[in-house]
């Protein structure tokens, strides 16, 4: 028995060291933390467990529109304490050719409980294939590592449902896409200054882990799936998927990216959705700046017998600056044409906040305030409808632990 144990210990070593490189699991913050990994003696096998826990205090105040005072509905709703993410997972690689990641979000339910489950096969730096459940290649805001975002809430223009004067077979879509099941080719070329992603996904989102799609009735023979692509230029080398890291305050990185996708027979075969986006992000020393602009076109499937089409757009600009080694101040201006270009008026969401990275504890404290404004609507009814379900005043304070 002692010989067997000795052989195992000689083949596998447990290393406990500071983790300064970015782990490609797309989930946890590596800022200022120490972790451990199990690694074979030759480095052919690496296994790393991780966790991310977020607890938030929220205050949301809503306008009177949409509230029924007869039922004593209050202006303050959806407030209190919440756990946005409680993630437990592990990631690793084998022979520097295959990497893998599996994690659950215990704060979610249904299919979203499984947040990620994928493996990545690397032919070379220019060509790899990822299969499973992972982030779709669309928008800098979503592709940022969870836990390394500038503010605790991603831009509202990506997460809020659009408005249209028709009833779909499912909820109205959002411009953002997020996690999905599929396969994707990706790679880095030109000394890591150019990247690409091209993938096919179910198009049903993070809450569905089964195959539910069919062939398109409108485009004969085409599977009713989600087709996505993204290209990016990084003039100063690979851009880390972070929006602020106190361990990386002496670097210079930039990314300019274009992305596009189409979801065939989305919303339970109600619509065909096409999206496009532009991304720009810049990090130099203590400063981080990013801006995005995105667009979505919705056309109805033939079976809906609706001739209307709708176009939506949105975007944001945000900046963060480390005023001290552990303190980052943040501001964002977010805007969206939620009721489609066929009607006048937009919503805009200015926000500001701060991040405090508590040294040597793996803790990160985030706080933000966001205001919901409306501008340019033709009628008061249009103005009232445009922010239904969205808080006029929103405050979030979140404490995060990552390991």
Annotate the PLM regions.
Residues 4-54, 403:
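N-terminal periplasmic/intermembrane-space "pro-region" immediately following the signal or transit peptide
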Residues 20-26, 118-122, 223, 248-403:
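Outer-membrane beta-barrel pore domains
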Residues 33-35, 227-242, 352-355, 398-400:
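Short, well-ordered amphipathic alpha-helices
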Residues 36-62, 67-69, 73-206, 223-238, ...:
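Outer membrane beta-barrel
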Residues 72-76, 103-105, 169-171, 209-217, ...:
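Extracellular loop and loop/strand-boundary signature of outer-membrane beta-barrel proteins
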Residues 197-199, 207-217, 241, 269-270:
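A short secondary-structure junction signal
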């Amino acid at each position: 028995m002692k010989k067997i144990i000795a052989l195992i210990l000689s083949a596998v070593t447990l290393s406990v060291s500071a983790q300064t490189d970015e782990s490609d699991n797309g989930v946890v913050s590596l800022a200022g933390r120490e972790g451990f990994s199990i690694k074979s003696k030759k480095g052919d096998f690496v296994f790393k467990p991780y966790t991310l826990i977020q607890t938030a205090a929220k205050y949301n105040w809503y306008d009177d529109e949409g509230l029924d005072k007869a039922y004593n509905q209050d202006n303050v709703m959806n407030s209190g304490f919440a756990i946005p993410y409680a993630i437990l997972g592990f990631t690793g690689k084998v022979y520097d050719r295959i990497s893998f990641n599996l994690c659950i979000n215990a704060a979610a339910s249904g299919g979203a409980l499984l947040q990620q489950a994928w493996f990545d096969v690397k032919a070379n730096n220019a060509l790899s294939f990822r299969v499973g459940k992972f982030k779709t290649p669309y928008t800098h805001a979503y592709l940022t590592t969870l836990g390394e975002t500038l503010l605790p809430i991603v831009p509202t223009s990506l997460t809020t449902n659009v408005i249209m004067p028709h009833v779909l077979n499912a909820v109205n879509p959002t411009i953002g896409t997020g996690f999905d099941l599929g396969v994707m080719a990706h790679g880095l070329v030109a000394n890591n200054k150019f990247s690409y992603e091209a993938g096919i996904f179910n198009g049903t989102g993070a809450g569905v882990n089964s195959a539910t799609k069919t062939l398109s009735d409108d485009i004969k023979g085409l599977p009713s799936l989600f087709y996505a692509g993204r290209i990016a230029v990084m003039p100063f080398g690979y851009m880390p998927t972070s929006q602020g890291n106190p361990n990386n305050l002496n670097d210079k990185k930039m990314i300019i990216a274009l992305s596009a996708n189409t979801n065939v027979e989305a919303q339970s075969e109600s619509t065909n959705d096409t999206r496009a986006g532009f991304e720009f992000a810049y990090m130099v020393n203590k400063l981080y700046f990013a801006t995005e602009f995105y667009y979505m076109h919705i056309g109805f499937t033939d079976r809906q017998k609706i001739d209307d089409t709708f176009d939506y757009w949105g975007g944001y600009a945000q900046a963060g600056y480390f005023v001290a080694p552990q303190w980052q101040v943040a501001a964002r201006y977010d805007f969206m044409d939620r009721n489609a270009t066929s009607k006048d008026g937009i919503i805009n969401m200015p926000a500001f906040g701060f991040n405090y990275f508590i040294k040597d504890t793996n803790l990160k404290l985030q706080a933000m305030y966001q205001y919901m404004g409306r501008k340019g609507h033709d009628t008061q009814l249009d103005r009232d409808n445009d922010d239904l379900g969205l808080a006029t005043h929103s405050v979030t304070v979140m404490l995060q632990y990552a390991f």
